[in-house]
């Protein structure tokens, strides 16, 4: 084997070993163990949804050629499974009843699963997708129609929450082509707004943020530093923050 080929081999091997023994890998393994020891049947949850009405919605709002991400949410089987994992990762399947606000609630699958475990949920999203309008009605998910803007407070909801979530967040992209995004100052404003106006004293904010268009992590060194300065616990694409900036939040909180 040539020296250059041997070098590339060891570089790839070292990267694989680094991933295998990283903190993220250990935490991921712990997530899988927790799900395995406390299983939740996504199939049973799916069976509680009116499949005939869901199919009617699919037929009424067929796939759109230029809306791949929205089209994907018509696969309720897949997304119920995904959101069961979200519920398990936050230990919501074994927690006492909580008040939950879901930012960018989309089709409403997450809040629907939460309700089956006794939690009270409210979604916040724009009203541009007719399919989402239909599914949230079908699932009985309450939502507030609003758009999240940088440096702008969210609308007053008249209450505070035990948990505020945002899964597959994309509201921080200012332009559709994802070339312009929120600044660290915009994120700091947003986090402060959530903490002071929407979280109860022991509340948590969970953000799962989509990777960048090139597949790299959302958390650039600058953004990671900003979130960590706010007391965030960062795990892969997720950031968990407590109501109190000085506290280190936990995914397990029952």
Write out the residue ranges for each language-model feature:
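Conserved alpha-helix/loop element of class I SAM-dependent methyltransferases that forms part
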Residues: 76-97
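Conserved class I S-adenosyl-L-methionine
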Residues: 97-106
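Conserved SAM-binding loop of SAM-dependent methyltransferases across substrates and taxa
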Residues: 107-118
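Conserved SAM-binding strand-loop segment of SAM-dependent methyltransferases
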Residues: 140-151
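A short acidic, Gly/Pro-enriched loop at the edge of an enzyme's catalytic core
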Residues: 154-163
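A short SAM/SAH-binding and catalytic strip from SAM-dependent methyltransferases
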Residues: 163-184
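A short glycine-rich, Lys/Arg-flanked "PGG" loop and its adjoining helix->strand segment in the class I
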Residues: 180-201
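Conserved beta-strand signature within the Rossmann-like core of class I S-adenosyl-L-methionine
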Residues: 201-210
